[in-house]
């Protein structure tokens, strides 16, 4: 019980965690009724955050301890201007981090939740093209 959990710091660690979150979001959206929109949006935010942190590691940046996707995207933009293309998706999703998960007053429509899910997949798709080594393709060293 004294063992510390392994620190997440490799791109692969971040990607695996992100994939778990997006898989949970997809599963809940497809199978649970009523649809738990806020929980799905939370998992979407978490997936996007972890994908971005994995990308930052590949870009040579230590990911900060933050849930703010705008901040993570801005850090990545310093290395590659192309990250501006996902900045609006990051801005939409960032609001669904920890607080909405516990705020019983937050209500999200299924339509809005599906939009959040779509933006998360936009971020993932961008990263698959921009930084393929995050997904096990290509050489990490060649991407910086």
Q: PLM features: what roles do these ranges have?
A:
Residues 1-144:
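Terminal alpha-helical segments
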């Amino acid at each position: 019980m004294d063992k510390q959990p392994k620190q997440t710091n490799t791109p692969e660690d971040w990607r695996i965690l992100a994939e778990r979150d997006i898989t949970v979001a997809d599963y809940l959206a497809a199978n649970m009724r009523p649809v738990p929109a806020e929980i799905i949006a939370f998992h979407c935010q978490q997936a996007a955050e972890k994908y971005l942190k994995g990308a930052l590691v590949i870009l040579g940046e230590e990911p900060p301890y933050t849930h703010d996707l705008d901040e993570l995207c801005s850090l990545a933009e310093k290395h590659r201007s192309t990250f501006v293309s996902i900045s609006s998706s990051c801005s939409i999703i960032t609001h669904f981090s920890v607080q909405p998960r516990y705020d019983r007053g937050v209500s999200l429509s299924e339509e809005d939740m599906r939009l959040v899910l779509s933006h998360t997949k936009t971020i993932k798709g961008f990263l698959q093209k921009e930084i393929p080594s995050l997904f096990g393709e290509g050489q990490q060293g060649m991407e910086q």
